[in-house]
Swiss-Prot record:
Coiled coil: none annotated. Pfam families: NAD_synthase. Disulfide bonds: none annotated. One of its GO terms (biological process) is NAD biosynthetic process. Its EC number is 6.3.1.5. It comes from Buchnera aphidicola subsp. Acyrthosiphon pisum (strain Tuc7). Belongs to the NAD synthetase family. It catalyses: deamido-NAD(+) + NH4(+) + ATP = AMP + diphosphate + NAD(+) + H(+). GO terms for cellular component: cytoplasm. This is NH(3)-dependent NAD(+) synthetase.
């Protein structure tokens, strides 16, 4: 078995999807978990205004609405968290995403003071962190806030990770990857866009250039320039299509070099 086939099998990506069916599958997946865990009453997503969080949040809102109707239980809620670091440069996109999602509840927590406080404490101890490390601090602080809200709201922290991120390791260990459940894990980027389009998401949101925007020294830097390969090519690889050798080598090197991010902690 080639490495490509092994990765596809492991990540569970389908070569083609029917958006309506995938939307139903994602909602049913979330519903089933909540029904089987009666103490959980809310779904929590950090909404950035990007494709991944917009889709995940919309699916969660649909799940909460469906459960309220089917179970006649108004305690099922979706909570959207706004977690900017200082001023968010694409604030309009985030507001547009919120209007599209229509969350039951919204909490706004600016993480900048917490991140800088942590950095200051490290500096006092003699540890000077780089801009890159500070970026990871932001991702982990956001996840910390989500779990705090989840703990107080009988909630489940829902991940926004997908197969195109997973294969490249383009996420922060114990940051955006540290979630309870992940409904879109088997989708690639173009499939995420298809689902958003099917749900009548504003076009500028599902066509938006993906960016993590974690580093202060590289604001608004898009994912593809960091990865060295486009999501379109990554998606084709995940759909078992033939791609150019250079891109294949980049993708497979990224996968192999980030195995530790996808594995459980090492034990004896």
């Amino acid at each position: 078995m080639t490495l490509q086939k092994k990765i596809i099998e492991l990540l569970g990506v389908k070569p083609a999807i029917i958006p309506e069916i995938e939307i139903k599958n994602c909602v049913d997946f979330l519903k089933k978990y909540l029904v089987n865990h009666v103490h959980i009453k809310s779904l929590i997503v950090g909404v950035s205004g990007g494709q991944d969080s917009t889709l995940t949040a919309k699916l969660c809102q649909m799940t909460a609405e469906t459960l309220r109707k089917e179970k006649n239980d108004i305690t099922y809620q979706f909570i959207a968290l706004r977690l900017p670091y200082g001023i968010q440069y694409d604030e309009k996109d985030c507001q547009d995403a919120i209007r599209f999602i229509q969350p039951d509840q919204i909490f706004n927590v600016n993480i900048k003071k917490a991140v800088l406080s942590s950095e200051k404490s490290l500096k006092k101890s003699g540890v000077i962190i780089s801009d890159y490390v500070r970026g990871n601090e932001k991702a982990r602080e956001r996840m910390k806030v989500q779990y705090s809200v989840a703990a107080m709201k009988q909630g489940l922290v829902v991940g926004t990770g997908h197969a195109a991120e997973n294969i490249t390791g383009f996420f922060t260990k114990y940051g955006d990857s540290g979630t309870d459940i992940n409904p879109i894990a088997k989708l690639n980027k173009r499939q995420i866009r298809l689902l958003l389009k099917n749900l009548n998401c504003p076009k500028h949101l599902y066509l938006k250039k993906p960016m993590a925007d974690l580093e202060d020294e590289h604001p608004q830097q898009d994912d593809e320039s960091v990865l060295g390969v486009t999501y379109d090519v990554i998606d084709s690889y995940l759909e078992q299509k033939k791609i150019d050798i250079r891109s294949q080598k980049i993708i497979e090197a990224l996968y192999l070099n980030t195995l530790h991010k996808r594995n459980l902690p090492i034990t004896q």
